Swiss-Prot record:
The lineage of its organism: Bacteria, Bacillati, Bacillota, Bacilli, Lactobacillales. PROSITE patterns: SAICAR_SYNTHETASE_1, SAICAR_SYNTHETASE_2. It is an enzyme of class 6 (ligase). It holds the Pfam family SAICAR_synt. This is Phosphoribosylaminoimidazole-succinocarboxamide synthase. It comes from Streptococcus agalactiae serotype Ia (strain ATCC 27591 / A909 / CDC SS700). It comes from the Bacteria.
Amino acid sequence: MTNQLIYTGKAKDIYSTKDENMIRTVYKDQATMLNGARKETIDGKGALNNQISSLIFEKLNMAGVVTHYIEQISKNEQLNKKVDIIPLEVVLRNVTAGSFSKRFGVEEGRVLETPIVEFYYKNDDLNDPFINDEHVKFLGIVNDEEIAYLKGETRRINELLKDWFAQIGINLIDFKLEFGFDNDGKIILADEFSPDNCRLWDAEGNHMDKDIFRRDLGSLTDAYQVVLDKLKTLD
């Protein structure tokens, strides 16, 4: 059925389209934390995230990364390929921050000699637990070869993103990616890339990401607008 709501999430709603292999993604003006325990409507957030994610995915596509992104169709909507989402959050950390610092008792801001890739099991009931490769295989999520691909592709994407953000004076601290299987069974990048699912610090260490909301540091949309404006200056 066309235009049927098929999934509602914390930050996005997904609708069917005339093409069964495509979906329409609508970005919402909602900010959440602690798996939705705290919610707040922030006018303009959805449009900013959609525009930032669209710009990043367009550049990734051009760089040879296979993604679900097709096109931006309005300020807060985009057209995507339909995929079967892999229930893993793939997190890459360039600098210690957030839960990593708390888990291992290290200060925020320590540059990691080698970026660290982590897996989290996408399960709201379990609060998305931190898991390792053996857990991933035990749960039957993906196999050894697919684990290696997810890690390698995430590291490749990191090198591209770090370079782009460095060009506009922003440090890419960490980020979360999601992948899915397309109709041909190929793993491709899905979901989004916005300040909602990464940490971005300017040269002075000021947050330009969702930590502004988490830590009550000021205007979320003002910071997101700066990120968007800077990204638009990239070649």
